Amino acid sequence: MESDENTNSYTTEEDAEYAVLLDRREQLTDLLAESPYNLIHYLQRAVVHSNLGYPDLAAGDAYRALLLTDEVRNEGFEYHDQAVDALEPYSSSPSALPEVLRHGALQQGSGDMVNGHGPQGPESYQEIAAVASVRCYQIISLSLLLCGCLSSAHTYCERGLAASPHNQELLNTRSHILTVGRGRLQTQDVDVGRLPEWGHVRREVYPWNHHEPDRFSGKSLSFLNRELASMAPKCEVRVSELPVLLDSASNTDDYEIIPTCHQLGVFAKEDIAPGETVLNEYSLLTANNRLKDQLCDACGTELPPLSAGAGPVSCDDCQDTVFCDQFCHDKAQELYHPAVCEKDVDAIAKDPDAAESSASLHLLLLARLLAMSVHQEVHPLQLTNVKYIWGDFIPPRTNAISVSPNAGPPPDWTLPFSFKYNVETPLHILEKMDIDIYQTLPQHDLWVLNTCLAKFRGTASARQSIRDGRPDVAAVHPFWCLANHDCNPNVTWEWGGRMRLWARERKVVGDQPGGIKAGEEILNHYCDTDLPVQKRREWAEGSLGGWCMCKRCRDEIAQNGLDGSATNGVNGAAPDGVDGVDGTDAVDGMDGVDDSSTEPMDWAPHSKKKDVVMTDSDVLLRD
């Protein structure tokens, strides 16, 4: 396929190179399955990932290699013997380093390494480990720079320079980090403590991801409808035709015919009366970022008082883990808790700073999913909790970086990424769970974790604390998120241990009677429907992956112009808390949620002001 000025697709020549790189990646992944403690294979795969245009995956591989250099250099470490044995094929000739280490000045060996970072003994594997550690720092720091994670990039660059102060590649990378930092901080005098930590990476179904189902197939729809029957007996999952989302304001708002795409949706099989429950969904894929808070570990609801008849129920083996009732206790023991019982993971990512509340919840949702996967012995992406969720993925070719001189601008990568929250801490959690992060690479490779996080960001709802307004409890309800968004919804929702959808008593637009007729689609809402159209679109952009193109939004834009900020389109009034009412703007720091987060929060408020959608629902595709 030829590229042109408006695409980032590969040229025919690049297609061939891309195919070779994908084949090499597969070979190295197979080699890692055979020799999971081989740090050289990790570095080789990091280089391939970098050449494929996945700097985040390159950083993840180099980090695992860096951990293995520590295993080699320290006899008391858990995997020392395995890591040393894996280097045996490279140790026959002390003067010959593996090709991946002969990079720039590193081909001269460890001669300029200082501060105790050189070889820890005369063995040839010690020389390899010492040189490899610097190569790891090179790859990690440059890759994180390319992801936009300047703070971590600077940290690992400085660690590399502490070991090899004159390494030119590290010196160049540090210079580039500071240059980019000046642009992002808009100052010539860069305070490295203020360098941003969050960047963005590719959000896609990776070419080697064979776990993603055909969501529109008869088999998938049959499974989903069997599961849905007990939660929403009057509904069914079907394929829905939806407007394609745009990235910004467009004159297509007033077109009668607009581009559409297909996604899953929920439809009424029977008439549903106003106020009638549409869906009642229970989920164990929950997270709580408050340490020792009085919440059920399983469903996230508040614990009943000790005097209650059923009362809270504790785990017999770890008394600190408490459930709201016997049902939640039994479900937790069946589906996830034994994987974390007495494993000292409770305090990780708890009681975060305000700026990290959102990130901690996404991380803890990932931790819960990993516990489910480990206990059930099922690959994380095969768990039904996430398998059929769409993660607002963008086709790999759209994400591709073309080297053609006629190529357009670089693509906009859309998955928020932090080295701490996407790489370091997930691996730390797995180690706390007594999981061998090398042997279980197929289940816990970084691309797997990224895919899970993309799906969470597409479906998670959260509850704000009544104490400080921060999000402190989150959950993924995979069937609730199948109900597509509309700014004139026919249902509303509340989450309190279970996610409940019910038919609205009155419609938002025109104050028409509520209720849903058989055959009509269930239309959910991921933003405050009282907001004017521009505010709604800004809120829902994080939830939907683009600007809402529902009929109400397009009608109001056509009526009010592209800014669409005059009224809420329902009664002509500015809603409470908007445009300076009460001295605040509803979009900034929503109801006490700290808006200074360095991680993109992308949360949309529920009308009850305590439940929020965390981001990117299973809805419309970006144009």
Tell what function each PLM region has.
Residues M1-D623:
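Short alpha-helical interaction motifs and adjacent low-complexity tails used for partner binding
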